[in-house]
Amino acid sequence: SGPYSSTDNPKHTEQETPKHLEHFNNYPKKIYYKYNSKGFRDNEWPEDVSDVIWCVGDSFTLGCGQPQNESWPAVLEKLTNKRCINLGQDGASNDTIALRVQEIQKVYNPKLIVIMWSYLHRRRVNGIDVGSDKNDFGDDADIKNFLKNYDAVNSLPTKIIHLTVPLSMYNDGDELMKQSERTAYGNEISEPIKKKILFLMKNNVTEVKQ
């Protein structure tokens, strides 16, 4: 617990995105990161989780740079009047997100999981989330890896709602990070699949599995 988390600290802002430093230093809302006994930025879980909404993702789900009550799981909880459990993790790759969803299904038999997928270039290598996998690098590889994770969770016997992080955030990134915002034109992935996933990623479209 503390006032900073991951990229949400003045040192990172000064080094990586100095043009935002004034905004950072004059942000009007008080930000504090408090984690529950399971290691997530959320209140303690209720004893009965049979009818909760499970929210899985990266720092966008955790609510990096936001008060806890303004994270999207917290807002969803207010809108639905149902307990929404925040399983956001700073820097989580889609590999980690998919593994977490499968574990939730195995342990809790959930009724509904909402996934906010992360950037395609992030990978889980040797059990650690990294910015990219140098041994499996590029747009085609990233899309194939994403589809692997997408299919793995979409085959689970529960309702899944898919969301994505806003890729416009890459405007402040370097060339390596921008790769996942570009269209891939390799031959290994069919054009209909490419169009579907790129439309989903670009427009933050919600797709509900019935």
Residue ranges of model-derived segments:
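N-terminal secretory targeting modules
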Residues: 1-54, 107-111, 116-137, 154, ...
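Surface-exposed cleft-lining segments at the edges of enzyme active sites
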Residues: 59-64, 89, 128-147
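Serine-esterase "nucleophile elbow" of acetyl-processing enzymes
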Residues: 36-95, 100-105
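Conserved beta-strand->loop/alpha-helix structural units within folded catalytic cores of enzymes
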Residues: 146-156
